[in-house]
Amino acid sequence: MEVAPLMAEILRKNQVKATFFAANERTQTGDGSLGTHWADWWKARAAEGHEFASHTWDHTYWRSDVVGGPGVAPQFRVSPSAGPSEGREFIWTAQQYCEEVGRASARLQAITGKKPLPLFRAPGGKTSPRLLAAAKACGYQHVGWSPAGFLGDELSSDRYPNAFLLKKALRDIQPGDILLAHLGIWSRKDPWSPAVLEPLIVGLKSRGFCFQTLREHPQYKAWIEAQVSRTPAKLAK
């Protein structure tokens, strides 16, 4: 979250609305990205018209399916990368996974007063058809990103300098692509956002691009509209 204020200012300055997928991850300042320290930051983004969705509560990675015999409901081997169970492995039912997704969504709504979109992004984009079906059954459709939309802010700055990433994105991004960037990557020595985000937005706009949230994306719009009057099942209390 260390570059979150700068990213928010760049988005505001350039009149760009984004969809933030949030998990309660460790931060260099405060009590986690969905803790009280950052609550006002999230509230301000809601007031600006941004959208929100779940990235799971403890940034929990799917590792594999655990498939039983006939008639046995699928389970999932998972590993949280934040929170008190960081680094451990568990076998979860579909209901437990839904609760993990729903907990982040519920916290975002409690902080911002705005209902998050009925979407989620699995950490690392790691899923299986069974996991996607389980999440969809409790009201959440998965959102990945476009190949050209992987902006590279989590890659090594030695191998992938900012100038290279900017040039590649401006060359390859196509209409309808979903772009992926983070609110801070500790491991990258040369921070991406201060050097790339605004030139990327300006450059794409000069090519005739506009920016919208996932609420307006044709791949997800019908799903969101169908779910808007429903409360996703299995939310954590």
Predicted features along the sequence, with ranges:
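Charged helix-capping and loop-helix junction motifs
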Residues: 34-38, 161-165, 193-197
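C-terminal domain-boundary segment and adjacent tail
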Residues: 14, 18, 189-237
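Active-site-proximal loop/turn and secondary-structure-junction residues that shape catalytic pockets
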Residues: 24-26, 58-60, 126, 148-151, ...
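Basic- and aromatic-lined ligand-binding clefts that recognize polyanionic substrates
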Residues: 111-135
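His/Asp/Glu-enriched short active-site or ligand-binding loop at hydrolase and phosphoryl-transfer sites
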Residues: 126-172, 209-220
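Structural recognition of the beta-strand scaffold that forms the well-ordered cores
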Residues: 18-22, 51-56, 118-122, 141-146, ...
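Short low-complexity, flexible loop/linker segments enriched in glycine and/or proline
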Residues: 34-37, 67-70, 157-160, 225-231
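Active-site beta->alpha N-cap acidic-glycine motif
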Residues: 1-92, 96, 100-118, 192
